[in-house]
Swiss-Prot record:
Protein name: Leucine--tRNA ligase
InterPro entries per UniProt: aa-tRNA-synth_I_CS, aa-tRNA-synth_Ia, Leu-tRNA-ligase, Leu_tRNA-synth_edit, M/V/L/I-tRNA-synth_anticd-bd, Methionyl/Leucyl_tRNA_Synth, Rossmann-like_a/b/a_fold, tRNAsynth_Ia_anticodon-bd
The protein's enzyme class: ligase
Catalytic reactions of this protein: tRNA(Leu) + L-leucine + ATP = L-leucyl-tRNA(Leu) + AMP + diphosphate
Source taxonomy: Bacteria, Pseudomonadati, Pseudomonadota, Gammaproteobacteria, Lysobacterales
Amino acid sequence: MSTVEPNAYDPQQVETSAQQFWDATRAFQVDENSDKPKFYCLSMLPYPSGALHMGHVRNYTISDVVSRYKRMTGHNVLQPMGWDAFGLPAENAAIKNKTAPAKWTYANIEHMRAQLKSLGYAIDWSREFATCTPDYYVHEQRMFTRLMRKGLAYRRNAVVNWDPIDQTVLANEQVIDGRGWRSGALVEKREIPQWFLRITDYAQELLDGLDQLDGWPDSVKTMQRNWIGRSEGLEIQFDVRDTTGAALDPLRVFTTRPDTLMGVTFVSIAAEHPLAQHAAKSNPELASMLETLKHGGVSEAELETQEKRGMATGLTAVHPISGEEVPVWVANFVLMGYGTGAVMAVPGHDQRDFEFANKYGLPIVQVVKLREPRNDDEQAWDATQWRDWYTDKSRELELINSAEFDGLDYHGAFEALAERFERKGQGQRRINYRLRDWGVSRQRYWGCPIPVIYCAKCGAVPVPEDQLPVVLPENVEFAGTGSPIKTDPTWRQTTCPECGGPAERETDTFDTFMESSWYVARYTSPNARDMVDRRANYWMPADLYVGGIEHAILHLMYFRFYHKLMRDARLVDSDEPVTNLLTQGMVIAETFYRDADNGGKDWINPADVEIQRDERGRVVGASLIADGQPVHIGGTEKMSKSKNNGVDPQAMVAKYGADTVRLFSMFAAPPEQSLEWNEAGVDGMARFMRRLWVQVHKHVGEGAAALDVASLSAEQKAIRRKTHETIGKVDDDYGRRHSFNTAIAAVMELSNALAKFDDASAQGRAVRQEALEAMVLLLNPITPHASHALWQVLGRGETLLENVPFPQVDAAALVRDALTLAIQVNGKLRGTIEVAADAAREQIEALALAEPNAAKFLDGLSVRKIIIVPGKIVNIVAG
C-alpha cells in the first residue's frame, strides 16, 4: 500500500500537461461534418480591457461546464471566443497612455487570450476574431448599405450630449452633474444629424417572438416587453394659435388615456420643438430658458428624477372638444425624440403633469372617479396631494366633469372619442411603441466607419460594395479632442461614386452594439466571404447564451433585431439568434475603507486587510496588514475598480490552480444568484482537490480488480448504490437544472462515503475503482485538468475525456436489499426500522409496532389504523 502526501498535487504541472495535450490534438476544434446533434454554447464576448475579472471567470466557466458536459453526452459542440474591441474605453486609455487605441487594444487581446487559455476553457480558437478588424466590420458595412437601399437605414437630426470644449458627443454616463467627465464643461443638448435603423418596423415581431423564447428567463422577457412598450391609444389633433390669434401648425399628441381628455389644462412640448423655437424668436426670456434646458439630461432615467422645469410659450392650443384655449408650455420632461415631442397634460391623472401644474399654478381638474372606492382615501380627491389611484385604469372607472361623456367607463369613452375624432378628421386609433429607432451614429474615432459618402449634388450615397471596407486608420495620434479622421483630409475627402464629383466621407462611426449584434452568426463561418455562409444554418440558433442580466434590454434587443435583418436578407433561416439564455449573477466581495482627508473614502483591497470573523463567518473586525490599524467595514458589493474590492483571477490561478478557481466559482452559489468571493471557501475547494488526488493515488497503490456485481456484500452494494445515485443527480444538475453547486456537493458526498469505506478486498477495490472513475468523469466539466490526469492514474490512458461517454446510471445498482422506513405515531417521527425490500405488509406493521420508541408512545393507546407509504414512512394512527 502506497501513501501519497496531499502536497503531491501540483496544479501548475497538471494543468500545463493537460493544456499541452489539448493544444497538440486540437481537441476543441469542430466542424459541421458530424452525425452528432449540434450544441452551440456561447458566452457574451469580452471587451479587451486588459485583464480578466472574476465576473469573466464565472461567465466563461458556466459556459465551459455546459460545453464539456454536452460533449460527453454525445453532442458536436461549438464554444467560440472573440473580442468586442471597438469602443470608448480604448479612446480613454489612448489619452491616458499616449498611445493609439488600436495598439492598446491588440496588446490587451494578447494578454487576455493567454489568461483565458490558462483557465483551460474548451474553446475553438480557430474561430477567434476581433470586431475592430476590417475582415469583420466589412460585413456590417455591406449590410448597412443594403439597409440604406431598402429604407431601413436613414438619417435625421437627434438630440445628443455635446461637450463644447472637447468638441465631441458624450454618452449619458459621461455627463456628471451636467458637466463633461473629462473637460468639466457644461454639457449642451444639441441636434445633429444621426443615422438610424428602423427597429420600430420590427417592434411587433420582436414582441411576439418573446412568446416563443421558452428558454429565456421571464425577467428578461418582461423587461423587453416593457421596453418595446406596445400601447393602444388615440392620436389627437390640437389646433394652435399664436399671441395674435393666428393659426399655426397643429399639434398631434398620442395618448393611451383619451378618457381623461376633458382634464387637459395645458399642452407640454419639448424645448427643441419647432413651435418652441418659433415662440422664442419674439420672447427673449423663453429663448434664455430654451438655452438653459439644453444642459438637461436626455435619458429617461434623468427625466424621471430631475426637477420639473418649464415656461409658458405664449401660444395656445384649442381643446378639440370644448373649444377652449389652453396654454402651451415648454417642459424639460418632454423629449423631441419621443413621439411627436408634445403631450397633452392632464395633471389630475398623471403624476408628472400633477407636479408640474402644482409648481407653476396651472389648473388641475378631476375627470375620473372610482366606481367602487375601497376606502375614504379613494373617495377623496385633492388637487394638492397625489394619490396613486388617480392614474389607475385597471379598476372600474367613471368619467365626471366630461360633458356628454359623463358616466362612461374607460372603454366606453375610448370608443366614443375614437369614433368622434375619426369622423371629424381630428384623430385616429393608433398602436404606439415605446421602442424608438436605433441611433447607430457615434461621433467617435475608435469604431467602424459608417460607409456613406456625402455629395453636394447627389446627397448621402452608400459606398459601393466593391469599395468596401472603408478602413479605419489605426496608426493615429489620439488626444481626445475630436476625431483623428475628421481632421485628416486625405481620409475624409473622396469622390462621389455616382457623379464622380468631389465628396466627403461620413466621419461618424457605428455604435459598438452593431458589432455585438451579429457576432454569434459570424462564429459559425468566420472565414466566409459574405457575412455568413451555409454553415450558419447548421449552428444557428445558438443553444445557450450566457451573460449578465444588465444586457437584457439594449444588447439582447438589438441582438434579436439584427438577426431578423439577417433572416430577411436570406443569410440565416432562424427567427431568433438564441434558444436558451442563462443570466448569471454578479460576483461580490467585502469592501473596506478609511476616511480620506477630503471627506471621501479611500477604498482598500481585501487582500491588504486582516479580517476577523465570528463563528458564522461574518466580518466583525478588520485591520490594514501594512500598519495593523483598524479599517472600516463597507459591506459586500459588486467587485469593481471604484470600490477596490476586485480579486485578480491570475493571482488566484497562480496560487491555487485553475481547477480550484473554477470549482469554487461553480460551488459558491447557483449560476443565477450573486456569488460572494471568499478566499476561505477557495481554500476549502483546494483541500477537496488534494483529498481527491490522494484518494485516487492511494487506491491505485492497492491495485484494482474486476467488478462482479453478483458477489457484492451489503456494504459494497451500498457504495455502488451511492455511486449511481450520484451519477443520476449530477447528470440532472448539469443537463436540466444547471445547478452546478449541488452537483459538486453530490460528488463531495460520494468522496466522503468512499473515505469511510475501508474494504481492501478484491470486490471492495472494484467498487472503489468504479466510484473513483465516476467521480473523475463527473467532475471533468468543472475540473478538466485534474480529471485528465487522474483518468490516466486510474489506468485508462491519456485521452480527451470529452470523448468518453458521461457515466450512465445502472438501474440495478439502485435496487436496495433493505429499506429504512421512518416510523410516525400520529404524524410525529418516533423512530426508524430496517426491513427487507420485499417485506410483506404484515411484517412491516409488526416491526413498526415493536420499535421501542414508537411502542413507548403507543402505551395505553389503541391502534386505529396503520398507513404505509412504500419505501418511506409508516404512520401509526392511535387514540
